[in-house]
Amino acid sequence: MSENPPTLFSAYKMGNFNLSHRVVLAPMTRCRAINAIPNEALVEYYRQRSTAGGFLITEGTMISPSSAGFPHVPGIFTKEQVEGWKKVVDAAHKEGAVIFCQLWHVGRASHQVYQPGGAAPISSTSKPISKKWEILLPDATYGTYPEPRPLAANEILEVVEDYRVAAINAIEAGFDGIEIHGAHGYLLDQFMKDGINDRTDEYGGSLENRCKFILQVVQAVSAAIATDRVLIRISPAIDHTDAMDSDPRSLGLAVIERLNKLQFKLGSRLAYLHVTQPRYTADGHGQTEAGANGSEEEVAQLMKTWRGAYVGTFICCGGYTRELGLQAVAQGDADLVAFGRYFVSNPDLVLRLKLNAPLNRYDRATFYTHDPVVGYTDYPSLDKGSLL
Protein backbone atom coordinates (compact mmCIF):
# COMPACT_ATOMS: atom_id res chain seq x y z
CA MET A 1 0.00 0.00 0.00
CA SER A 2 1.53 3.32 -1.08
CA GLU A 3 2.14 6.09 1.42
CA ASN A 4 0.20 9.33 1.22
CA PRO A 5 2.15 12.13 -0.51
CA PRO A 6 3.75 14.68 1.81
CA THR A 7 2.09 18.01 2.54
CA LEU A 8 3.30 21.40 3.74
CA PHE A 9 2.65 20.11 7.24
CA SER A 10 4.56 16.83 7.00
CA ALA A 11 7.79 16.35 8.90
CA TYR A 12 11.04 16.55 6.93
CA LYS A 13 14.66 15.70 7.71
CA MET A 14 16.94 18.38 6.26
CA GLY A 15 20.40 16.95 6.77
CA ASN A 16 20.94 16.87 10.52
CA PHE A 17 17.82 18.94 11.22
CA ASN A 18 14.43 17.41 11.95
CA LEU A 19 11.70 19.79 10.80
CA SER A 20 8.08 19.38 11.91
CA HIS A 21 6.65 21.09 8.82
CA ARG A 22 7.79 22.44 5.46
CA VAL A 23 6.79 26.12 5.71
CA VAL A 24 9.95 28.25 5.69
CA LEU A 25 10.38 31.91 6.63
CA ALA A 26 11.94 33.42 3.51
CA PRO A 27 14.73 35.98 3.92
CA MET A 28 13.32 39.51 3.72
CA THR A 29 14.99 42.90 4.15
CA ARG A 30 13.14 44.88 6.85
CA CYS A 31 15.53 47.78 7.72
CA ARG A 32 15.05 47.62 11.50
CA ALA A 33 18.64 46.93 12.58
CA ILE A 34 19.58 50.49 13.52
CA ASN A 35 23.25 51.15 12.75
CA ALA A 36 23.54 47.59 11.39
CA ILE A 37 23.23 45.98 14.84
CA PRO A 38 20.50 43.41 15.60
CA ASN A 39 18.36 44.72 18.45
CA GLU A 40 15.39 43.76 20.62
CA ALA A 41 12.98 44.48 17.76
CA LEU A 42 14.67 41.78 15.68
CA VAL A 43 14.60 39.41 18.66
CA GLU A 44 10.83 39.80 18.91
CA TYR A 45 10.25 39.65 15.14
CA TYR A 46 12.02 36.33 14.72
CA ARG A 47 10.64 34.92 17.98
CA GLN A 48 7.09 35.59 16.77
CA ARG A 49 7.72 33.63 13.57
CA SER A 50 9.45 30.68 15.24
CA THR A 51 7.70 27.35 15.69
CA ALA A 52 8.84 24.06 17.16
CA GLY A 53 10.59 22.28 14.31
CA GLY A 54 10.21 25.28 12.01
CA PHE A 55 12.89 26.72 9.75
CA LEU A 56 13.79 30.42 9.52
CA ILE A 57 16.18 32.16 7.14
CA THR A 58 17.16 35.65 8.26
CA GLU A 59 17.06 38.78 6.21
CA GLY A 60 20.10 39.53 4.08
CA THR A 61 23.01 40.20 6.44
CA MET A 62 26.04 42.24 5.41
CA ILE A 63 29.36 40.42 5.25
CA SER A 64 31.44 43.63 5.18
CA PRO A 65 31.07 47.42 5.27
CA SER A 66 31.00 47.57 1.46
CA SER A 67 28.13 45.10 1.13
CA ALA A 68 25.33 47.49 2.15
CA GLY A 69 22.61 48.68 -0.20
CA PHE A 70 19.72 49.48 2.16
CA PRO A 71 19.45 51.59 5.32
CA HIS A 72 19.67 49.86 8.69
CA VAL A 73 20.23 46.30 7.55
CA PRO A 74 22.13 44.02 9.93
CA GLY A 75 25.73 42.98 9.56
CA ILE A 76 27.77 40.09 10.88
CA PHE A 77 31.31 41.41 10.58
CA THR A 78 31.78 43.05 14.01
CA LYS A 79 31.72 41.70 17.56
CA GLU A 80 28.77 43.92 18.46
CA GLN A 81 26.76 42.56 15.55
CA VAL A 82 27.56 38.97 16.53
CA GLU A 83 26.45 39.67 20.10
CA GLY A 84 23.20 41.15 18.81
CA TRP A 85 22.52 38.10 16.67
CA LYS A 86 23.11 35.78 19.63
CA LYS A 87 19.95 37.14 21.26
CA VAL A 88 17.94 36.61 18.08
CA VAL A 89 19.20 33.05 17.68
CA ASP A 90 18.55 32.25 21.35
CA ALA A 91 14.95 33.44 21.01
CA ALA A 92 14.36 31.27 17.94
CA HIS A 93 15.98 28.25 19.56
CA LYS A 94 13.86 28.62 22.71
CA GLU A 95 10.79 28.21 20.48
CA GLY A 96 12.33 25.08 18.97
CA ALA A 97 13.16 26.56 15.55
CA VAL A 98 16.14 26.05 13.25
CA ILE A 99 17.60 29.35 12.03
CA PHE A 100 20.12 30.11 9.27
CA CYS A 101 21.77 33.47 8.56
CA GLN A 102 21.66 34.75 4.97
CA LEU A 103 25.04 36.19 3.96
CA TRP A 104 24.66 39.10 1.57
CA HIS A 105 26.71 41.41 -0.62
CA VAL A 106 24.67 43.67 -2.88
CA GLY A 107 27.51 44.55 -5.28
CA ARG A 108 26.44 47.26 -7.73
CA ALA A 109 22.94 47.44 -6.18
CA SER A 110 24.26 50.11 -3.83
CA HIS A 111 25.13 53.81 -3.72
CA GLN A 112 28.11 55.91 -2.61
CA VAL A 113 26.14 56.96 0.47
CA TYR A 114 26.37 53.38 1.75
CA GLN A 115 30.00 52.80 0.80
CA PRO A 116 33.04 53.42 3.04
CA GLY A 117 34.57 56.75 2.05
CA GLY A 118 31.85 57.35 -0.53
CA ALA A 119 33.50 54.92 -2.94
CA ALA A 120 31.80 53.42 -5.98
CA PRO A 121 30.03 50.09 -5.37
CA ILE A 122 31.80 46.98 -6.63
CA SER A 123 30.59 44.52 -9.26
CA SER A 124 31.60 42.27 -12.14
CA THR A 125 31.15 45.23 -14.47
CA SER A 126 31.23 49.01 -14.81
CA LYS A 127 27.67 49.03 -16.19
CA PRO A 128 25.23 50.72 -13.80
CA ILE A 129 21.74 49.45 -13.11
CA SER A 130 19.36 51.23 -15.47
CA LYS A 131 17.19 54.17 -14.44
CA LYS A 132 14.17 51.87 -14.55
CA TRP A 133 15.26 50.91 -11.04
CA GLU A 134 15.74 53.18 -8.02
CA ILE A 135 17.58 52.69 -4.76
CA LEU A 136 16.15 53.48 -1.32
CA LEU A 137 18.38 56.05 0.38
CA PRO A 138 18.84 56.66 4.13
CA ASP A 139 16.58 59.75 4.04
CA ALA A 140 13.70 57.60 2.69
CA THR A 141 13.93 59.11 -0.81
CA TYR A 142 14.85 57.14 -3.91
CA GLY A 143 17.91 57.73 -6.07
CA THR A 144 19.63 56.48 -9.21
CA TYR A 145 22.14 53.64 -9.07
CA PRO A 146 25.69 54.90 -9.76
CA GLU A 147 28.34 53.41 -12.02
CA PRO A 148 30.06 50.53 -10.20
CA ARG A 149 33.73 49.62 -10.16
CA PRO A 150 34.61 46.18 -11.57
CA LEU A 151 36.56 44.05 -9.12
CA ALA A 152 40.08 43.01 -10.03
CA ALA A 153 40.64 39.25 -9.92
CA ASN A 154 42.73 39.45 -6.73
CA GLU A 155 40.01 41.54 -5.04
CA ILE A 156 37.48 38.79 -5.68
CA LEU A 157 39.47 36.53 -3.37
CA GLU A 158 39.24 39.20 -0.68
CA VAL A 159 35.44 39.11 -0.95
CA VAL A 160 35.54 35.30 -0.74
CA GLU A 161 37.42 35.74 2.52
CA ASP A 162 34.74 38.16 3.76
CA TYR A 163 32.13 35.45 3.17
CA ARG A 164 34.26 32.89 5.00
CA VAL A 165 34.76 35.10 8.05
CA ALA A 166 31.07 36.06 8.10
CA ALA A 167 30.13 32.37 8.10
CA ILE A 168 32.43 31.72 11.06
CA ASN A 169 30.87 34.69 12.86
CA ALA A 170 27.39 33.31 12.17
CA ILE A 171 28.26 30.00 13.80
CA GLU A 172 29.76 31.91 16.74
CA ALA A 173 26.43 33.72 17.07
CA GLY A 174 24.74 30.34 17.38
CA PHE A 175 23.16 30.04 13.94
CA ASP A 176 22.52 26.49 12.76
CA GLY A 177 23.92 27.35 9.34
CA ILE A 178 24.16 30.00 6.64
CA GLU A 179 22.58 30.76 3.29
CA ILE A 180 24.74 32.32 0.57
CA HIS A 181 22.64 34.90 -1.29
CA GLY A 182 23.46 34.29 -4.94
CA ALA A 183 20.17 35.64 -6.29
CA HIS A 184 18.11 38.71 -7.19
CA GLY A 185 20.76 40.72 -8.98
CA TYR A 186 23.19 41.03 -6.07
CA LEU A 187 26.96 40.57 -6.27
CA LEU A 188 27.24 36.83 -6.95
CA ASP A 189 24.35 37.01 -9.41
CA GLN A 190 26.13 39.88 -11.17
CA PHE A 191 28.93 37.46 -11.99
CA MET A 192 26.67 34.59 -13.08
CA LYS A 193 24.37 36.50 -15.45
CA ASP A 194 25.67 37.18 -18.97
CA GLY A 195 23.42 40.25 -19.21
CA ILE A 196 25.66 41.90 -16.60
CA ASN A 197 29.02 40.14 -16.64
CA ASP A 198 31.09 41.52 -19.53
CA ARG A 199 34.48 40.44 -18.18
CA THR A 200 37.21 38.91 -20.33
CA ASP A 201 39.23 37.30 -17.52
CA GLU A 202 38.74 33.94 -15.76
CA TYR A 203 35.52 35.23 -14.16
CA GLY A 204 33.76 36.13 -17.42
CA GLY A 205 32.60 34.68 -20.70
CA SER A 206 31.82 30.97 -20.38
CA LEU A 207 29.35 29.45 -17.93
CA GLU A 208 32.30 27.81 -16.21
CA ASN A 209 33.98 31.16 -15.64
CA ARG A 210 30.81 32.96 -14.59
CA CYS A 211 30.10 30.29 -11.96
CA LYS A 212 33.66 30.42 -10.58
CA PHE A 213 33.13 33.16 -7.96
CA ILE A 214 30.08 31.60 -6.33
CA LEU A 215 31.72 28.17 -6.22
CA GLN A 216 34.80 29.67 -4.57
CA VAL A 217 32.51 31.15 -1.92
CA VAL A 218 30.71 27.84 -1.37
CA GLN A 219 34.02 25.97 -1.05
CA ALA A 220 35.55 28.51 1.35
CA VAL A 221 32.49 28.63 3.58
CA SER A 222 32.06 24.84 3.54
CA ALA A 223 35.68 24.38 4.62
CA ALA A 224 35.17 26.85 7.45
CA ILE A 225 31.90 25.64 9.00
CA ALA A 226 31.05 22.22 7.41
CA THR A 227 29.21 21.56 4.16
CA ASP A 228 25.93 20.49 5.76
CA ARG A 229 25.59 23.92 7.36
CA VAL A 230 25.84 25.73 4.03
CA LEU A 231 23.14 26.46 1.52
CA ILE A 232 22.81 28.64 -1.51
CA ARG A 233 20.04 30.75 -3.04
CA ILE A 234 19.88 31.39 -6.78
CA SER A 235 17.40 32.98 -9.20
CA PRO A 236 18.53 32.16 -12.76
CA ALA A 237 15.33 33.46 -14.38
CA ILE A 238 14.81 36.62 -12.30
CA ASP A 239 15.71 39.95 -13.92
CA HIS A 240 15.61 42.09 -10.77
CA THR A 241 17.85 45.18 -11.22
CA ASP A 242 18.63 44.18 -14.83
CA ALA A 243 19.99 40.77 -13.78
CA MET A 244 19.17 39.10 -17.08
CA ASP A 245 20.66 36.00 -18.63
CA SER A 246 20.26 34.86 -22.22
CA ASP A 247 19.60 31.25 -21.17
CA PRO A 248 18.29 31.00 -17.58
CA ARG A 249 17.51 27.30 -17.87
CA SER A 250 21.10 26.44 -18.80
CA LEU A 251 22.51 28.80 -16.18
CA GLY A 252 20.48 27.11 -13.46
CA LEU A 253 21.55 23.67 -14.64
CA ALA A 254 25.20 24.77 -14.81
CA VAL A 255 25.17 25.97 -11.20
CA ILE A 256 23.35 22.83 -10.05
CA GLU A 257 25.72 20.50 -11.91
CA ARG A 258 28.71 22.16 -10.26
CA LEU A 259 27.10 22.06 -6.82
CA ASN A 260 26.36 18.35 -7.26
CA LYS A 261 30.00 17.70 -8.22
CA LEU A 262 31.22 19.77 -5.28
CA GLN A 263 29.03 17.82 -2.87
CA PHE A 264 30.46 14.56 -4.22
CA LYS A 265 34.01 15.89 -3.93
CA LEU A 266 33.46 17.07 -0.36
CA GLY A 267 31.70 13.85 0.61
CA SER A 268 28.80 15.72 2.18
CA ARG A 269 25.64 17.37 0.95
CA LEU A 270 24.92 21.06 1.24
CA ALA A 271 22.01 21.85 3.55
CA TYR A 272 19.82 22.76 0.56
CA LEU A 273 19.40 24.69 -2.67
CA HIS A 274 16.93 27.60 -2.54
CA VAL A 275 15.53 28.80 -5.87
CA THR A 276 13.34 31.85 -6.48
CA GLN A 277 11.14 31.11 -9.44
CA PRO A 278 10.11 33.45 -12.26
CA ARG A 279 6.73 34.12 -10.68
CA TYR A 280 8.65 36.69 -8.62
CA THR A 281 8.69 40.09 -10.35
CA ALA A 282 9.48 43.55 -9.06
CA ASP A 283 8.76 47.19 -9.65
CA GLY A 284 11.47 49.83 -9.84
CA HIS A 285 11.67 50.16 -6.08
CA GLY A 286 12.38 46.48 -5.63
CA GLN A 287 9.01 45.77 -4.03
CA THR A 288 7.78 42.44 -5.22
CA GLU A 289 4.52 41.02 -6.44
CA ALA A 290 3.60 37.65 -7.84
CA GLY A 291 3.24 38.23 -11.55
CA ALA A 292 3.27 36.57 -14.93
CA ASN A 293 6.91 36.37 -15.96
CA GLY A 294 6.25 33.63 -18.49
CA SER A 295 3.21 31.37 -18.37
CA GLU A 296 2.45 29.32 -15.27
CA GLU A 297 3.35 26.22 -17.29
CA GLU A 298 6.76 27.66 -18.25
CA VAL A 299 7.41 28.63 -14.64
CA ALA A 300 6.49 25.16 -13.42
CA GLN A 301 8.64 23.43 -16.02
CA LEU A 302 11.74 25.46 -15.16
CA MET A 303 11.41 24.60 -11.50
CA LYS A 304 10.77 20.93 -12.28
CA THR A 305 13.92 20.86 -14.42
CA TRP A 306 16.11 22.40 -11.74
CA ARG A 307 14.56 20.35 -8.98
CA GLY A 308 15.09 17.14 -10.95
CA ALA A 309 18.75 17.99 -11.54
CA TYR A 310 19.70 18.87 -7.96
CA VAL A 311 20.82 16.14 -5.58
CA GLY A 312 19.57 17.24 -2.17
CA THR A 313 16.96 19.33 -0.39
CA PHE A 314 15.21 21.79 -2.70
CA ILE A 315 13.41 24.91 -1.46
CA CYS A 316 11.17 26.92 -3.76
CA CYS A 317 10.11 30.52 -3.24
CA GLY A 318 8.33 33.27 -5.14
CA GLY A 319 4.66 34.20 -4.92
CA TYR A 320 3.50 30.92 -3.43
CA THR A 321 -0.02 30.62 -2.07
CA ARG A 322 -1.21 27.88 0.26
CA GLU A 323 -2.56 25.95 -2.71
CA LEU A 324 0.61 26.30 -4.80
CA GLY A 325 2.75 25.30 -1.83
CA LEU A 326 0.68 22.21 -1.13
CA GLN A 327 0.87 21.29 -4.81
CA ALA A 328 4.65 21.78 -5.03
CA VAL A 329 5.32 19.48 -2.08
CA ALA A 330 2.73 16.85 -3.02
CA GLN A 331 4.08 16.59 -6.57
CA GLY A 332 7.69 16.40 -5.44
CA ASP A 333 8.62 19.71 -7.07
CA ALA A 334 10.02 20.99 -3.76
CA ASP A 335 10.84 19.62 -0.35
CA LEU A 336 10.21 22.91 1.45
CA VAL A 337 8.37 26.11 0.48
CA ALA A 338 9.53 29.57 1.60
CA PHE A 339 6.92 32.28 2.17
CA GLY A 340 7.77 35.98 2.32
CA ARG A 341 5.27 38.82 2.46
CA TYR A 342 2.51 36.86 4.14
CA PHE A 343 4.97 35.84 6.85
CA VAL A 344 5.53 39.57 7.39
CA SER A 345 1.86 40.15 8.18
CA ASN A 346 1.11 36.77 9.77
CA PRO A 347 3.60 35.82 12.48
CA ASP A 348 1.55 32.64 12.98
CA LEU A 349 1.50 31.83 9.26
CA VAL A 350 2.18 28.13 9.81
CA LEU A 351 -0.95 27.77 11.95
CA ARG A 352 -3.06 29.86 9.57
CA LEU A 353 -1.98 27.79 6.58
CA LYS A 354 -2.68 24.56 8.44
CA LEU A 355 -6.18 25.72 9.40
CA ASN A 356 -6.74 27.45 6.05
CA ALA A 357 -7.58 30.51 8.14
CA PRO A 358 -7.85 34.05 6.72
CA LEU A 359 -4.56 35.94 6.39
CA ASN A 360 -3.78 39.46 7.58
CA ARG A 361 -3.06 41.80 4.68
CA TYR A 362 0.47 43.17 4.62
CA ASP A 363 1.17 46.91 4.56
CA ARG A 364 3.71 47.56 1.83
CA ALA A 365 4.32 51.10 3.10
CA THR A 366 6.01 49.68 6.24
CA PHE A 367 8.24 47.07 4.58
CA TYR A 368 11.38 49.25 4.73
CA THR A 369 10.61 51.73 7.49
CA HIS A 370 12.48 51.75 10.78
CA ASP A 371 9.77 51.70 13.46
CA PRO A 372 10.53 48.78 15.81
CA VAL A 373 6.84 47.94 16.20
CA VAL A 374 4.56 49.37 13.49
CA GLY A 375 4.39 47.07 10.49
CA TYR A 376 6.97 44.83 12.12
CA THR A 377 5.90 43.17 15.36
CA ASP A 378 2.32 44.47 15.69
CA TYR A 379 0.51 42.13 13.29
CA PRO A 380 -2.07 40.07 15.23
CA SER A 381 -1.97 36.32 15.68
CA LEU A 382 -5.01 34.08 15.86
CA ASP A 383 -6.71 33.81 19.23
CA LYS A 384 -5.68 30.27 19.99
CA GLY A 385 -8.17 30.06 22.84
CA SER A 386 -11.08 30.50 20.45
CA LEU A 387 -9.80 27.60 18.34
CA LEU A 388 -10.12 25.05 21.15
Swiss-Prot record:
Parts forming coiled coils: none
Tissue: Expression at relatively high level in glandular trichomes, and at lower level in leaves and flower buds. Weakly expressed in roots. Expressed both in apical and sub-apical cells of glandular secretory trichomes. Also present in non-glandular trichome cells.
Reactions it catalyzes: (11R)-dihydroartemisinic aldehyde + NADP(+) = (+)-artemisinic aldehyde + NADPH + H(+)
Matching InterPro entries: Aldolase_TIM, OxRdtase_FMN_N, Oye-like
Short sequence motif named Microbody targeting signal, residue ranges: 386-388
Pfam families: Oxidored_FMN
GO cellular component terms given for this protein: cytosol; peroxisome
Record's subcellular location: Cytoplasm, Cytosol
Positions annotated as active site in the UniProt record: Y186
pH-related activity note: Optimum pH is 7.5.
Application of this enzyme or protein: Artemisinin and derivatives (e.g. artesunate), are antimalarial drugs due to their endoperoxidase properties; they also display multiple pharmacological actions against inflammation,viral infections, and cell and tumor proliferation. Artesunate may be a promising treatment for COVID-19 mediated by the severe acute respiratory syndrome coronavirus 2 (2019-nCoV) (SARS-CoV-2) because of its anti-inflammatory activity, NF-kappaB (nuclear factor kappa B)-coronavirus effect and chloroquine-like endocytosis inhibition mechanism.
Job description of the protein: Involved in the biosynthesis of the antimalarial endoperoxide artemisinin. Catalyzes the double bond reduction of artemisinic aldehyde to produce (11R)-dihydroartemisinic aldehyde. Also able to reduce 2-cyclohexen-1-one into cyclohexanone to a lesser extent.
Protein name: Artemisinic aldehyde Delta(11(13)) reductase
UniProt gene name: DBR2
